[in-house]
């Protein structure tokens, strides 16, 4: 299924990133010469992805209910002797992973799925939300519910994808909650690798040492890790398969 189209959309508009500011805003000079302000859904540091003067792709969605009609969707980054397009819209990973499951791309890893629910409340205090809750088909040998936590992964060191790119107390909490779900349920961490130049995934110990420690603790407790890669094009996003992972940057 490598190369399978997961979602299609109207062709994006290309331009040059002039600046990103106030976390949510980015000024872009379109190839027509027009300068526009786009919404940036990614409020993090965007390590290794934010390149002033680099090429970007925007979605144009004019609407009276929107303050900004442009949204920053993709960024072009150096990759070896070439370039790679990276998805920077943090609202997409959950949708992409769900679509990949529905398309059967993860049948080998997850089995046949009967039902998928989004944003389900769970956890010891019932104050957390799992990205996806899967109910296996009755034919599956493993009938346990599957809790799926998805992490948008854009930072890369060479051909290695790394998450997180900064300290994430929220991510730490999610790992702790997932540990509590096994073995009565399956808990699966899915790094959603939003670029096509990756060979392996590692937790970002250099950015968040505690997250790295919890990642390894979760592995030992039975939490599964399934890194999923996608390729971002001008008018579609395709499935690039699952990737192997290492236990840490120094392992």
Swiss-Prot record:
Q: Which Pfam families match?
A: SfsA (PF03749), SfsA_N (PF17746)
The family database entries (Gene3D superfamilies) matched by this protein are listed as: 2.40.50.580, 3.40.1350.60
Molecular function per GO: DNA binding
Using the chain's own numbering, where are the disulfide bonds? none
Regions that span the bilayer: none
The entry's family comment says: Belongs to the SfsA family.
NCBIfam families per the UniProt record, alphabetical: sfsA (TIGR00230)
Query: What name has this protein been given in UniProt?
Result: Sugar fermentation stimulation protein homolog
Species the sequence originates in: Prochlorococcus marinus (strain SARG / CCMP1375 / SS120)
């Amino acid at each position: 299924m490598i190369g399978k189209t997961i979602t299609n959309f109207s062709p994006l508009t290309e331009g040059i990133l002039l600046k990103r500011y106030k976390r949510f805003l980015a000024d872009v000079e379109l190839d027509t010469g027009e300068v526009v302000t786009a919404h940036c859904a990614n409020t993090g540091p965007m390590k290794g992805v934010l390149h002033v003067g680099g090429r970007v792709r925007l979605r144009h969605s004019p609407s009276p209910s929107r303050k900004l009609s442009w949204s920053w969707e993709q960024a072009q980054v150096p990759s070896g002797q070439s370039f790679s397009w990276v998805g920077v819209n943090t609202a997409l990973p959950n949708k992409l992973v769900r679509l990949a499951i529905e398309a059967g791309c993860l049948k080998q890893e997850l089995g046949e799925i009967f039902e998928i629910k989004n944003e389900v409340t769970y956890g010891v205090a019932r104050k957390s939300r799992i990205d996806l809750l899967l109910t296996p088909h009755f034919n599956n040998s493993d009938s346990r519910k599957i809790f799926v936590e998805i992490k948008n992964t854009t930072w890369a060191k060479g051909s290695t994808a790394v998450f997180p790119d900064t300290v994430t107390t929220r991510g730490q909490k999610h790992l702790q909650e997932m540990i509590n779900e096994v073995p009565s349920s399956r808990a699966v961490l899915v790094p959603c690798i939003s670029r096509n130049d990756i060979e392996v995934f590692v937790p970002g110990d250099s950015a968040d040492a505690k997250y790295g420690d919890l990642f390894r603790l979760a592995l030992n407790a039975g939490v599964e890790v399934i890194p999923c890669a996608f390729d971002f094009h001008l008018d579609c996003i395709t499935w690039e398969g699952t990737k192997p992972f290492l236990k840490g940057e120094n392992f």
